[in-house]
Curated annotation (Swiss-Prot):
Organism per entry: Rattus norvegicus
Region described as Disordered: 54-104
Protein family per UniProt: Belongs to the natriuretic peptide family.
Molecular function via GO: hormone activity; hormone receptor binding; neuropeptide hormone activity; neuropeptide receptor binding; signaling receptor binding
Source species, domain of life: Eukaryota
Official protein name in the record: Natriuretic peptides A
Residue positions where Phosphoserine is found in the record: S128
Tissue specificity: High levels of expression in the atria compared to the ventricles. Very low levels of expression detected in extracardiac tissues such as the brain, hypothalamus, pituitary, lung and aorta.
GO BP terms in the entry: cardiac muscle hypertrophy in response to stress; cell growth involved in cardiac muscle cell development; cellular response to angiotensin; cellular response to hydrogen peroxide; cellular response to mechanical stimulus; cGMP biosynthetic process; cGMP-mediated signaling; female pregnancy
Gene designation per UniProt: Nppa
InterPro entries linked: Natr_peptide, Natr_peptide_CS, Natriuretic_peptide, Natriuretic_peptide_atrial
Keyword annotations: Cell projection, Cleavage on pair of basic residues, Disulfide bond, Hormone, Phosphoprotein, Secreted, Signal, Vasoactive, Vasodilator
Disulfide bond as UniProt keyword: yes
Post-translational modification: The precursor molecule is proteolytically cleaved by CORIN at Arg-122 to produce the atrial natriuretic peptide. Undergoes further proteolytic cleavage by unknown proteases to give rise to long-acting natriuretic peptide, vessel dilator and kaliuretic peptide. Additional processing gives rise to the auriculin and atriopeptin peptides. In the kidneys, alternative processing by an unknown protease results in the peptide urodilatin.
Amino acid sequence: MGSFSITKGFFLFLAFWLPGHIGANPVYSAVSNTDLMDFKNLLDHLEEKMPVEDEVMPPQALSEQTDEAGAALSSLSEVPPWTGEVNPSQRDGGALGRGPWDPSDRSALLKSKLRALLAGPRSLRRSSCFGGRIDRIGAQSGLGCNSFRYRR
């Protein structure tokens, strides 16, 4: 019993004595105050040069841009959908001697192509969970965020 009380006393002594004398010492060397001040000055300088995202584009300007984009896309509904084929008259140069890229035909064709691209399955399904390639793999395997939306 005597050795047990001595061992117990020794461990109690170490438990109370060591925390006061042993501190956390980092493995790396300590950073001096001048280095910290230089780093802080550098960060302040960078913050002055880089504008905050909210200041760059106020929410009001963003809503105006989305309204303009919506108006531009709503005008696309007037154009018939692009089937992916070119008319024989466009291929041959037109019946009236017009080239295949007459401005009116060209704009209608481009608008219908744009609408087809925007309405395609890949442009409709966007995910913030994965990147594009991983998202497609996830959709095919049944894993991932958009697996319930689109199946091949």
